[in-house]
Protein backbone atom coordinates (compact mmCIF):
# COMPACT_ATOMS: atom_id res chain seq x y z
CA UNK A 1 0.00 0.00 0.00
CA UNK A 2 2.84 2.39 0.78
CA UNK A 3 4.19 1.77 -2.71
CA UNK A 4 0.89 2.76 -4.33
CA UNK A 5 0.99 6.12 -2.55
CA UNK A 6 4.69 6.83 -3.03
CA UNK A 7 5.82 9.85 -5.00
CA UNK A 8 7.43 7.49 -7.50
CA UNK A 9 4.11 5.76 -8.16
CA UNK A 10 2.24 9.04 -8.46
CA UNK A 11 4.65 10.30 -11.11
CA UNK A 12 4.49 6.97 -12.93
CA UNK A 13 0.68 7.25 -13.06
CA UNK A 14 0.92 10.80 -14.34
CA UNK A 15 3.21 9.62 -17.12
CA UNK A 16 0.80 6.79 -17.91
CA UNK A 17 -1.97 9.35 -18.40
CA UNK A 18 0.22 11.57 -20.58
CA UNK A 19 1.19 8.63 -22.81
CA UNK A 20 -2.42 7.45 -23.13
CA UNK A 21 -3.38 10.95 -24.24
CA UNK A 22 -0.57 10.99 -26.81
CA UNK A 23 -1.67 7.60 -28.16
CA UNK A 24 -5.18 9.01 -28.53
CA UNK A 25 -3.89 12.12 -30.30
CA UNK A 26 -1.95 9.89 -32.69
CA UNK A 27 -5.05 7.78 -33.35
CA UNK A 28 -6.96 10.98 -34.14
CA UNK A 29 -4.17 12.14 -36.47
CA UNK A 30 -3.32 15.24 -34.46
CA UNK A 31 0.13 14.24 -33.20
CA UNK A 32 2.45 12.33 -35.55
CA UNK A 33 2.59 8.64 -34.68
CA UNK A 34 6.37 8.71 -35.13
CA UNK A 35 6.68 11.42 -32.51
CA UNK A 36 4.51 9.46 -30.07
CA UNK A 37 6.62 6.37 -30.66
CA UNK A 38 9.79 8.31 -29.96
CA UNK A 39 8.30 9.79 -26.80
CA UNK A 40 7.18 6.37 -25.58
CA UNK A 41 10.65 5.00 -26.17
CA UNK A 42 12.39 7.80 -24.30
CA UNK A 43 10.00 8.95 -21.57
CA UNK A 44 10.62 7.68 -18.07
CA UNK A 45 9.03 8.80 -14.81
CA UNK A 46 11.25 11.53 -13.35
CA UNK A 47 12.59 11.11 -9.86
CA UNK A 48 10.74 12.92 -7.08
CA UNK A 49 13.99 14.73 -6.35
CA UNK A 50 14.21 16.10 -9.90
CA UNK A 51 10.58 17.26 -9.82
CA UNK A 52 11.15 18.92 -6.45
CA UNK A 53 14.24 20.67 -7.81
CA UNK A 54 12.28 22.13 -10.73
CA UNK A 55 9.26 22.91 -8.56
CA UNK A 56 11.43 25.10 -6.35
CA UNK A 57 11.63 27.45 -9.33
CA UNK A 58 8.30 27.05 -11.15
CA UNK A 59 6.22 26.63 -7.96
CA UNK A 60 3.91 24.14 -9.71
CA UNK A 61 4.35 20.41 -9.28
CA UNK A 62 2.63 19.34 -12.51
CA UNK A 63 4.53 21.92 -14.55
CA UNK A 64 7.74 20.68 -12.95
CA UNK A 65 6.80 17.10 -13.89
CA UNK A 66 6.12 18.13 -17.50
CA UNK A 67 9.37 20.10 -17.72
CA UNK A 68 11.37 17.21 -16.26
CA UNK A 69 10.18 14.83 -18.97
CA UNK A 70 9.82 17.18 -21.94
CA UNK A 71 13.33 18.49 -21.38
CA UNK A 72 14.71 15.01 -22.05
CA UNK A 73 12.73 14.35 -25.24
CA UNK A 74 14.38 16.65 -27.75
CA UNK A 75 12.20 18.13 -30.53
CA UNK A 76 9.36 15.68 -29.82
CA UNK A 77 9.06 17.17 -26.36
CA UNK A 78 6.80 19.89 -27.77
CA UNK A 79 4.01 17.31 -28.04
CA UNK A 80 4.23 16.24 -24.41
CA UNK A 81 1.20 17.44 -22.37
CA UNK A 82 -0.42 18.60 -25.62
CA UNK A 83 -3.92 20.02 -25.08
CA UNK A 84 -4.02 19.03 -21.41
CA UNK A 85 -4.34 20.94 -18.16
CA UNK A 86 -2.78 19.89 -14.89
CA UNK A 87 -5.96 18.40 -13.43
CA UNK A 88 -6.40 16.20 -16.49
CA UNK A 89 -3.22 14.47 -15.43
CA UNK A 90 -3.56 14.72 -11.65
CA UNK A 91 -7.19 13.63 -11.32
CA UNK A 92 -6.89 10.85 -13.86
CA UNK A 93 -3.63 9.66 -12.33
CA UNK A 94 -5.25 9.69 -8.89
CA UNK A 95 -8.02 7.46 -10.24
CA UNK A 96 -5.38 4.91 -11.25
CA UNK A 97 -3.80 4.98 -7.79
CA UNK A 98 -7.19 4.64 -6.11
CA UNK A 99 -8.07 1.59 -8.19
CA UNK A 100 -4.81 -0.14 -7.27
CA UNK A 101 -5.09 0.77 -3.60
CA UNK A 102 -8.72 -0.29 -3.56
CA UNK A 103 -7.87 -3.77 -4.76
CA UNK A 104 -5.44 -4.13 -1.87
CA UNK A 105 -8.15 -3.10 0.59
CA UNK A 106 -10.61 -5.56 -0.92
CA UNK A 107 -8.00 -8.26 -0.37
CA UNK A 108 -7.63 -7.14 3.24
CA UNK A 109 -11.37 -7.30 3.79
CA UNK A 110 -11.37 -10.79 2.29
CA UNK A 111 -8.71 -11.98 4.70
CA UNK A 112 -10.56 -10.47 7.66
CA UNK A 113 -13.81 -12.05 6.50
CA UNK A 114 -12.13 -15.42 6.19
CA UNK A 115 -10.68 -15.20 9.69
CA UNK A 116 -13.96 -14.11 11.24
CA UNK A 117 -15.95 -16.79 9.43
CA UNK A 118 -13.58 -19.57 10.47
CA UNK A 119 -13.69 -18.56 14.13
CA UNK A 120 -17.47 -18.10 13.96
CA UNK A 121 -17.91 -21.68 12.78
CA UNK A 122 -15.46 -22.87 15.44
CA UNK A 123 -17.52 -21.20 18.17
CA UNK A 124 -21.00 -21.64 16.72
CA UNK A 125 -22.17 -23.37 19.91
CA UNK A 126 -19.92 -21.62 22.44
CA UNK A 127 -22.50 -20.24 24.85
CA UNK A 128 -22.05 -16.76 26.33
CA UNK A 129 -24.24 -14.10 27.81
CA UNK A 130 -25.48 -11.36 25.52
CA UNK A 131 -25.22 -7.84 26.90
CA UNK A 132 -27.32 -4.78 26.19
CA UNK A 133 -26.38 -1.43 27.75
CA UNK A 134 -23.42 -3.37 29.18
CA UNK A 135 -25.82 -5.44 31.31
CA UNK A 136 -26.59 -9.16 31.04
CA UNK A 137 -29.54 -9.72 28.68
CA UNK A 138 -30.08 -13.24 27.28
CA UNK A 139 -27.77 -16.06 26.17
CA UNK A 140 -26.24 -16.10 22.71
CA UNK A 141 -23.16 -17.78 21.28
CA UNK A 142 -19.75 -16.33 20.60
CA UNK A 143 -20.01 -17.67 17.07
CA UNK A 144 -23.10 -15.56 16.45
CA UNK A 145 -21.17 -12.42 17.41
CA UNK A 146 -18.54 -13.27 14.83
CA UNK A 147 -21.11 -14.25 12.19
CA UNK A 148 -22.54 -10.75 12.44
CA UNK A 149 -19.07 -9.34 11.92
CA UNK A 150 -18.66 -11.42 8.76
CA UNK A 151 -21.83 -9.95 7.26
CA UNK A 152 -20.82 -6.42 8.25
CA UNK A 153 -17.49 -6.90 6.51
CA UNK A 154 -19.37 -8.11 3.44
CA UNK A 155 -21.43 -4.94 3.43
CA UNK A 156 -18.17 -2.99 3.71
CA UNK A 157 -16.77 -4.91 0.75
CA UNK A 158 -19.84 -4.13 -1.32
CA UNK A 159 -19.74 -0.44 -0.39
CA UNK A 160 -16.06 -0.19 -1.23
CA UNK A 161 -16.62 -1.90 -4.57
CA UNK A 162 -19.28 0.68 -5.41
CA UNK A 163 -17.12 3.58 -4.25
CA UNK A 164 -14.19 2.35 -6.32
CA UNK A 165 -16.45 2.13 -9.34
CA UNK A 166 -17.49 5.71 -8.65
CA UNK A 167 -13.82 6.69 -8.71
CA UNK A 168 -13.09 4.80 -11.94
CA UNK A 169 -13.30 7.96 -14.00
CA UNK A 170 -10.84 10.21 -15.75
CA UNK A 171 -11.08 13.59 -17.42
CA UNK A 172 -9.10 15.11 -20.27
CA UNK A 173 -11.54 17.94 -20.90
CA UNK A 174 -9.17 20.83 -20.36
CA UNK A 175 -9.17 24.01 -18.34
CA UNK A 176 -12.92 24.31 -17.62
CA UNK A 177 -14.29 21.04 -18.97
CA UNK A 178 -15.23 22.29 -22.46
CA UNK A 179 -12.55 20.42 -24.48
CA UNK A 180 -11.43 23.79 -25.87
CA UNK A 181 -7.89 22.46 -26.38
CA UNK A 182 -8.70 18.75 -26.53
CA UNK A 183 -11.52 16.56 -27.84
CA UNK A 184 -14.16 14.29 -26.29
CA UNK A 185 -12.91 11.50 -28.52
CA UNK A 186 -9.39 11.98 -27.15
CA UNK A 187 -10.79 11.56 -23.65
CA UNK A 188 -12.78 8.47 -24.61
CA UNK A 189 -9.82 6.73 -26.26
CA UNK A 190 -7.34 7.60 -23.50
CA UNK A 191 -9.69 6.61 -20.68
CA UNK A 192 -10.45 3.32 -22.38
CA UNK A 193 -6.73 2.57 -22.59
CA UNK A 194 -6.42 3.35 -18.88
CA UNK A 195 -9.40 1.23 -17.86
CA UNK A 196 -11.45 4.27 -16.86
CA UNK A 197 -14.70 5.92 -17.91
CA UNK A 198 -14.81 9.58 -18.94
CA UNK A 199 -16.33 11.90 -16.35
CA UNK A 200 -19.69 12.81 -17.98
CA UNK A 201 -19.51 16.51 -17.08
CA UNK A 202 -16.35 17.87 -15.53
CA UNK A 203 -15.13 21.33 -14.69
CA UNK A 204 -11.39 21.74 -14.42
CA UNK A 205 -11.59 18.79 -12.03
CA UNK A 206 -13.53 15.61 -11.45
CA UNK A 207 -16.40 16.53 -9.09
CA UNK A 208 -15.36 15.90 -5.50
CA UNK A 209 -18.54 14.15 -4.39
CA UNK A 210 -16.86 11.03 -5.77
CA UNK A 211 -13.87 11.46 -3.50
CA UNK A 212 -16.09 12.26 -0.53
CA UNK A 213 -18.03 9.05 -1.11
CA UNK A 214 -14.78 7.10 -1.23
CA UNK A 215 -13.45 8.60 2.00
CA UNK A 216 -16.81 8.09 3.71
CA UNK A 217 -16.77 4.46 2.65
CA UNK A 218 -13.27 3.97 4.04
CA UNK A 219 -14.44 5.60 7.28
CA UNK A 220 -17.40 3.25 7.49
CA UNK A 221 -15.21 0.17 7.06
CA UNK A 222 -12.89 1.59 9.72
CA UNK A 223 -15.90 2.13 12.00
CA UNK A 224 -16.80 -1.54 11.62
CA UNK A 225 -13.29 -2.58 12.57
CA UNK A 226 -13.53 -0.21 15.53
CA UNK A 227 -16.78 -1.84 16.64
CA UNK A 228 -15.23 -5.30 16.50
CA UNK A 229 -12.07 -4.15 18.29
CA UNK A 230 -14.12 -2.42 20.98
CA UNK A 231 -16.00 -5.67 21.64
CA UNK A 232 -12.70 -7.50 22.04
CA UNK A 233 -11.49 -4.81 24.43
CA UNK A 234 -14.60 -5.14 26.57
CA UNK A 235 -14.33 -8.93 26.62
CA UNK A 236 -10.67 -8.62 27.68
CA UNK A 237 -11.48 -6.59 30.81
CA UNK A 238 -10.44 -8.33 34.02
CA UNK A 239 -14.03 -8.47 35.27
CA UNK A 240 -15.14 -10.19 32.04
CA UNK A 241 -12.04 -12.06 30.80
CA UNK A 242 -13.88 -13.94 28.05
CA UNK A 243 -11.37 -13.24 25.27
CA UNK A 244 -7.86 -11.89 24.80
CA UNK A 245 -5.85 -10.77 21.80
CA UNK A 246 -2.63 -12.68 21.06
CA UNK A 247 0.24 -12.08 23.48
CA UNK A 248 3.67 -13.09 22.21
CA UNK A 249 6.48 -14.79 24.06
CA UNK A 250 8.67 -12.10 25.57
CA UNK A 251 6.03 -9.40 25.13
CA UNK A 252 5.56 -6.86 27.93
CA UNK A 253 2.21 -5.34 28.78
CA UNK A 254 3.53 -2.55 30.97
CA UNK A 255 6.85 -0.96 31.83
CA UNK A 256 5.82 -0.95 35.51
CA UNK A 257 3.40 -3.86 36.07
CA UNK A 258 4.63 -7.28 34.92
CA UNK A 259 1.16 -8.82 35.25
CA UNK A 260 -0.43 -6.62 32.59
CA UNK A 261 -1.79 -8.12 29.39
CA UNK A 262 -3.47 -5.21 27.68
CA UNK A 263 -5.53 -5.27 24.44
CA UNK A 264 -3.15 -2.75 22.88
CA UNK A 265 -3.66 -3.73 19.24
CA UNK A 266 -7.44 -3.51 19.55
CA UNK A 267 -7.00 -0.12 21.23
CA UNK A 268 -4.74 0.96 18.38
CA UNK A 269 -7.43 0.05 15.86
CA UNK A 270 -9.98 2.16 17.73
CA UNK A 271 -7.60 5.10 17.65
CA UNK A 272 -6.88 4.80 13.93
CA UNK A 273 -10.59 4.60 13.17
CA UNK A 274 -10.89 8.13 14.55
CA UNK A 275 -8.28 9.32 12.06
CA UNK A 276 -10.03 7.72 9.08
CA UNK A 277 -13.38 9.09 10.25
CA UNK A 278 -11.95 12.61 10.59
CA UNK A 279 -10.49 12.33 7.09
CA UNK A 280 -13.98 11.65 5.73
CA UNK A 281 -15.07 15.03 7.08
CA UNK A 282 -12.22 16.63 5.13
CA UNK A 283 -13.50 14.89 2.01
CA UNK A 284 -16.94 16.38 2.55
CA UNK A 285 -15.38 19.82 3.03
CA UNK A 286 -13.65 19.42 -0.34
CA UNK A 287 -16.89 19.02 -2.30
CA UNK A 288 -17.70 22.73 -2.45
CA UNK A 289 -15.15 24.47 -4.68
CA UNK A 290 -15.31 27.90 -6.30
CA UNK A 291 -16.87 28.02 -9.78
CA UNK A 292 -15.04 25.58 -12.10
CA UNK A 293 -12.54 24.82 -9.31
CA UNK A 294 -10.17 26.28 -6.81
CA UNK A 295 -7.21 24.47 -5.32
CA UNK A 296 -8.28 24.39 -1.68
CA UNK A 297 -9.05 20.67 -1.94
CA UNK A 298 -5.64 19.69 -3.26
CA UNK A 299 -3.49 20.16 -0.18
CA UNK A 300 -6.05 18.35 1.98
CA UNK A 301 -6.46 15.42 -0.41
CA UNK A 302 -2.73 14.85 -0.60
CA UNK A 303 -2.92 14.00 3.10
CA UNK A 304 -6.29 12.40 3.73
CA UNK A 305 -6.63 10.07 0.74
CA UNK A 306 -3.27 8.27 1.10
CA UNK A 307 -3.49 8.33 4.90
CA UNK A 308 -6.96 6.79 4.91
CA UNK A 309 -5.91 3.98 2.60
CA UNK A 310 -2.73 3.34 4.57
CA UNK A 311 -4.49 3.38 7.94
CA UNK A 312 -7.34 1.11 6.84
CA UNK A 313 -4.94 -1.31 5.16
CA UNK A 314 -3.05 -1.61 8.44
CA UNK A 315 -6.27 -1.90 10.43
CA UNK A 316 -7.55 -4.78 8.31
CA UNK A 317 -4.24 -6.61 8.60
CA UNK A 318 -4.04 -6.25 12.38
CA UNK A 319 -7.72 -7.08 12.87
CA UNK A 320 -7.32 -10.32 10.92
CA UNK A 321 -4.24 -11.09 13.04
CA UNK A 322 -6.21 -10.55 16.25
CA UNK A 323 -9.08 -12.78 15.14
CA UNK A 324 -6.82 -15.55 13.89
CA UNK A 325 -4.99 -15.70 17.22
CA UNK A 326 -7.84 -14.66 19.52
CA UNK A 327 -7.88 -16.56 22.80
CA UNK A 328 -11.51 -17.54 23.43
CA UNK A 329 -12.22 -18.57 27.02
CA UNK A 330 -15.35 -20.68 26.76
CA UNK A 331 -15.32 -21.79 30.39
CA UNK A 332 -15.16 -18.19 31.59
CA UNK A 333 -18.08 -17.37 29.30
CA UNK A 334 -20.08 -20.13 30.95
CA UNK A 335 -19.16 -18.92 34.44
CA UNK A 336 -20.14 -15.34 33.61
CA UNK A 337 -23.45 -16.55 32.24
CA UNK A 338 -24.14 -18.54 35.39
CA UNK A 339 -23.13 -15.60 37.58
CA UNK A 340 -26.32 -13.84 36.51
CA UNK A 341 -28.41 -16.05 38.82
CA UNK A 342 -30.59 -17.16 35.91
CA UNK A 343 -32.13 -13.71 35.50
CA UNK A 344 -31.97 -14.08 31.73
CA UNK A 345 -34.95 -16.47 31.98
CA UNK A 346 -37.23 -13.54 32.90
CA UNK A 347 -38.75 -13.06 29.43
CA UNK A 348 -39.43 -16.79 29.11
CA UNK A 349 -41.41 -16.72 32.37
CA UNK A 350 -43.20 -13.54 31.31
CA UNK A 351 -44.38 -14.96 27.99
CA UNK A 352 -45.36 -18.28 29.54
CA UNK A 353 -47.61 -16.40 31.99
CA UNK A 354 -49.11 -14.31 29.19
CA UNK A 355 -49.84 -17.52 27.29
CA UNK A 356 -51.96 -18.68 30.25
CA UNK A 357 -54.18 -15.61 29.91
CA UNK A 358 -52.61 -13.37 32.53
CA UNK A 359 -52.66 -9.67 31.62
CA UNK A 360 -49.21 -8.64 30.38
CA UNK A 361 -48.46 -5.86 32.85
CA UNK A 362 -49.56 -8.02 35.77
CA UNK A 363 -47.31 -10.81 34.51
CA UNK A 364 -44.45 -8.33 34.03
CA UNK A 365 -44.74 -6.97 37.57
CA UNK A 366 -44.93 -10.46 39.03
CA UNK A 367 -41.78 -11.62 37.23
CA UNK A 368 -39.99 -8.35 37.93
CA UNK A 369 -40.56 -8.71 41.68
CA UNK A 370 -38.68 -12.01 41.69
CA UNK A 371 -35.98 -10.64 39.35
CA UNK A 372 -35.30 -7.67 41.60
CA UNK A 373 -35.17 -9.90 44.66
CA UNK A 374 -32.76 -12.30 42.94
CA UNK A 375 -30.56 -9.37 42.00
CA UNK A 376 -30.61 -7.66 45.38
CA UNK A 377 -30.27 -10.79 47.52
CA UNK A 378 -28.06 -12.71 45.03
CA UNK A 379 -30.53 -15.57 44.97
CA UNK A 380 -31.24 -17.92 42.09
CA UNK A 381 -34.08 -16.52 39.96
CA UNK A 382 -35.44 -19.91 38.83
CA UNK A 383 -35.60 -21.05 42.46
CA UNK A 384 -37.61 -18.00 43.46
CA UNK A 385 -40.00 -18.51 40.55
CA UNK A 386 -40.46 -22.18 41.35
CA UNK A 387 -41.29 -21.25 44.95
CA UNK A 388 -44.08 -18.92 43.81
CA UNK A 389 -47.28 -20.96 43.99
CA UNK A 390 -49.17 -18.63 41.65
CA UNK A 391 -46.59 -19.05 38.89
CA UNK A 392 -45.91 -22.74 39.49
CA UNK A 393 -49.63 -23.39 39.43
CA UNK A 394 -50.06 -21.78 36.03
CA UNK A 395 -47.15 -23.09 33.95
CA UNK A 396 -44.78 -26.04 33.57
CA UNK A 397 -41.46 -24.44 34.46
CA UNK A 398 -39.05 -27.15 33.27
CA UNK A 399 -39.25 -26.19 29.56
CA UNK A 400 -39.24 -22.50 30.53
CA UNK A 401 -35.83 -22.92 32.14
CA UNK A 402 -34.37 -24.89 29.22
CA UNK A 403 -31.14 -23.14 28.23
CA UNK A 404 -31.23 -24.75 24.79
CA UNK A 405 -34.28 -22.65 23.91
CA UNK A 406 -32.06 -19.63 23.32
CA UNK A 407 -29.85 -21.30 20.74
CA UNK A 408 -32.42 -23.39 18.87
CA UNK A 409 -32.18 -21.19 15.74
CA UNK A 410 -28.39 -20.91 15.64
CA UNK A 411 -28.10 -23.49 12.85
CA UNK A 412 -30.58 -21.52 10.73
CA UNK A 413 -28.54 -18.35 11.13
CA UNK A 414 -25.34 -20.17 10.27
CA UNK A 415 -26.92 -21.47 7.07
CA UNK A 416 -27.00 -17.82 5.99
CA UNK A 417 -23.30 -17.51 6.79
CA UNK A 418 -22.58 -20.65 4.78
CA UNK A 419 -24.49 -19.20 1.83
CA UNK A 420 -22.46 -16.00 2.09
CA UNK A 421 -19.25 -18.01 2.09
CA UNK A 422 -20.30 -20.14 -0.88
CA UNK A 423 -21.61 -17.19 -2.90
CA UNK A 424 -24.03 -19.64 -4.45
CA UNK A 425 -27.13 -17.55 -3.81
CA UNK A 426 -27.79 -13.89 -3.11
CA UNK A 427 -27.68 -12.94 0.53
CA UNK A 428 -28.77 -9.48 1.64
CA UNK A 429 -26.00 -8.45 4.01
Labelled PLM ranges:
Residues 207-310:
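A conserved active-site cap/scaffold subdomain adjacent to cofactor or substrate pockets
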Residues 275-358, 366:
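Long, amphipathic alpha-helical stalk/connector segments used for oligomerization, subunit docking
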Residues 31, 36, 240-241, 359:
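Conserved hydrophobic residue
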Residues 29, 269, 312, 363:
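Residue-level signal for inorganic ion chemistry
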Residues 187-204, 208:
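Active-site-adjacent "gating/activation" loops or surface patches in catalytic cores
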Residues 342-393:
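C-terminal hydrophobic structural anchor segments
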Residues 1-173, 179, 184-189, 198, ...:
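A helix-coil-helix interface module used to build multimeric assemblies
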Residues 121-143, 243-254, 259-260, 291-300, ...:
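Glycine-rich cofactor-pocket loops
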Amino acid sequence: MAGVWSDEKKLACWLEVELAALDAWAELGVVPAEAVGAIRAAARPPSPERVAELEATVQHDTAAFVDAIAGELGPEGRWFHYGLTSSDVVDTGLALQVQQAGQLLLGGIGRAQGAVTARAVEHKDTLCIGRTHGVHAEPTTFGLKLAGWAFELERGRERLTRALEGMRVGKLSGAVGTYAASDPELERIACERLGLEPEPVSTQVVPRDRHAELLSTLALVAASIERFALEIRHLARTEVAEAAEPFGRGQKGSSAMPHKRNPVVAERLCGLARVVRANAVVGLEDVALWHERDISHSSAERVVIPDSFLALDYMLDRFAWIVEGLEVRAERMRRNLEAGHGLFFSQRVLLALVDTGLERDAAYRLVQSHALRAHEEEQDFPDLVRADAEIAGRIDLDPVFDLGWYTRHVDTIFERLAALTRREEPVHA
